[in-house]
Amino acid sequence: MPKSEIHPKWYPDAKVICNGEVVMTTGSTQPELHVDVWSGNHPFFTGTQKILDTEGRVDRFMKKYGMGSANSSESKDQKEEKDSKK
């Protein structure tokens, strides 16, 4: 026989609240769930996603740490070696 009163109380109509407004209902062990982000206001789901320019960030990193000229000279040397072997 299972023990009585060991399980939490279940709320089948728990309210999910975001920015002071009820956005949905669900089952939970708490009567109200307060969330900061949900699919209705998240940029990924609303289509207002900001895409970062990663190429510009890589170039800025290479320039900052002086790797841009080192990589380009190595690639030229490698090309010359390949051409001389042929």
UniProtKB/Swiss-Prot annotation:
PROSITE patterns for this protein: RIBOSOMAL_L31
One matching Pfam family: Ribosomal_L31
Alphabetical UniProt keywords: Ribonucleoprotein, Ribosomal protein, RNA-binding, rRNA-binding
The UniProt record lists the keyword Lipid metabolism: no
GO MF annotation: an example: rRNA binding
Sequence intervals crossing the membrane: none
Gene3D superfamilies assigned: Ribosomal protein L31 (4.10.830.30)
Cysteines engaged in disulfide bonds, as pairs: none
Region spans: Disordered: 64-86
One GO cellular component, as annotated: ribosome
Keyword Transmembrane helix: no
Basic and acidic residues biased stretches: 74-86
Subunit structure: Part of the 50S ribosomal subunit.
Known function: Binds the 23S rRNA.
Family, per entry: Belongs to the bacterial ribosomal protein bL31 family. Type A subfamily.
Name used for this protein in its record: Large ribosomal subunit protein bL31
Organism taxonomic ancestry: Bacteria, Bacillati, Cyanobacteriota, Cyanophyceae, Synechococcales
